[in-house]
Each structure stands twice: as C-alpha cells, then as structure tokens.
A protein has these predicted regions:
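Macromolecular interaction modules
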Residues: 1-126
C-alpha cells in the first residue's frame, strides 16, 4: 500500500472551525462518493486541535516552528499505478475533488507527498 499525505492550510478568510466543518461535512462525502472509481482504500482526516499555549510550547521546544497545519488528509492506495492513467472517470473524479478543495484549502501553501509507512509501535507489531 502507498499513502498520499496532504498537509492542509485553510483559506485565509476561513476560521479553523469553518474549515474543519466544511472539510468534514462537505468534502468528505465527495471523497467517499468517488472512492471506488479512484480506488481509495482508506481515507482519514486528521483535524488540528487548537489548544491554547500548545503551539507556543512547541515553538519553544523546537527553537521556533512554523504555524501548524490545519489538518492532514491521508489516502491509501494499492499502488501508484491506480492513481493515474487515462480513464476519463478517474480524471473527472480528480477534477471534481480539486475544484472543491479550492473552496476551503490554501492550495499553494498545502504540500502533498506520497509515502510508505514503516510501523515502529502499533497494534500490528509482532
């Protein structure tokens, strides 16, 4: 399995609550509806918890730190091969999701990358 990680920053005019509500209640169903055609095996939203003083503590610990992301999307696929291709249905689903992402994500400041997990501690460890 391969995982797409998308570190999200909200559009500047949105509050954290507005961003997270839109992501959870509007965008998530769009992803779920397109999961089969896109061959998404798993989709997880990681929502930032805004705890007073926590970011300042992290900045102090790390000797400075950029502003945290507003959330992280994690999408699992069987392989890179299923993510591309010339299938019009796949291209259409990708375009629809990208169009919706522009409604709530600051896309130029939200990096994404492909990753492979190496579990160190967890339930599946033997």
């Amino acid at each position: 399995m391969i995982k797409l990680v998308f570190a999200l920053r909200r559009r500047p005019e949105m509050t954290l609550d507005e961003f997270q509500t839109y992501w959870r209640e509007t965008h998530a169903p769009l992803v779920a509806e397109r999961a089969e055609v896109l061959q998404i095996r798993r989709y997880v939203q990681v929502h930032t918890t805004d705890l007073p003083g926590l970011h300042a503590a992290f900045q102090k610990r790390n000797g400075g730190a950029p502003e945290p992301f507003d959330g992280v999307a994690e999408l699992w696929f069987d392989s890179l091969d299923v993510m591309g291709g010339d299938d019009p249905a796949v291209r259409q689903a990708q375009a629809e999701l990208l169009a919706d992402e522009a409604n709530f994500i600051d896309l130029p400041n939200s990096p994404m990358w492909m990753s492979e997990e190496f579990e160190v501690v967890g339930l599946t460890q033997t």
